Amino acid sequence: MKAMILFGHGARDSRWREPFDRLVQLWQAQHPNTPVELAFLEMMQPSLEEAVSSLSLKGVTQITVVPVFFGQGGHLRNDFPVLLEACQQQHPNITLSATPAVGEDLAVLQAIVDFGARAL
C-alpha cells in the first residue's frame, strides 16, 4: 500500500500547523484510499520517524515524503536526507522516496501568482 507524508518545518505557535491540517483534510477527501500523515522537522509532532512508524503499523509499503517548503534551503539539503536515511534504516521493508520542495513546482508557483492577482 502507498502513502504520503507532508513534511513541514514546525513552529512554536500551534496555529502555524493549521494549513497543514487543511492539506491533510483535502488529501483525505480527494484520495480516501491513500493514507496521509503530517511530520515536522522540529518544534512540532509527529517527527518524520513517528509518521513513518505510524504508516508502517497500517501496512504501508511505499511512502512518498512531500516537503512542504518553499525552496531547498539548508534543512532540506542537509538535515532532511539524514532523517530520511535514518527512517529507511529503521524500516527496511518500506520504500521511502521524496519529492522536491513544493515551492519548486511550477503549478504551486502559478497558484501563488494567481492568489496575488485575485488580491488586486
Which residue ranges define each predicted feature?
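Active-site-proximal alpha-helix that buttresses catalytic centers in soluble enzyme cores
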Residues: M1-L120
